[in-house]
Amino acid sequence: MKEDIIGLFQETVEDTSSEIPSIAALLRINKYDLDQTVTNELDFILGAVFSQIINRFKIYSTNRSMKISESDLDELYLLLFSKAEEFKQLILKSTNSS
């Protein structure tokens, strides 16, 4: 995989990681009644973080006219999902949960 693709992906992960407190706060607003729909808040927020990273990466790579192969995407998604525990710890810190 090209180094510029991995670099862009890392930038996307870092940008999104810094917004975990905002993502968590948005998803915890009571008016959405998400607590009635989702029973595991931590995994729900984690899913939103994954979604945000994937979405931003697609936007960033499109803006830079990068062509990403399916095999590269598979590798990047494996890298992303391998960071689940790291993101969970950031979410727990951001939401003051234990």
Where are these regions (language model features)?
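Amphipathic alpha-helical interaction modules
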Residues: 18-60
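Alpha-helix boundary/N-cap detector
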Residues: 3-7, 11, 37-48, 67-71, ...
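Low-complexity intrinsically disordered segments
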Residues: 1-16, 86-98
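Charged low-complexity stretches with an acidic bias
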Residues: 58-98
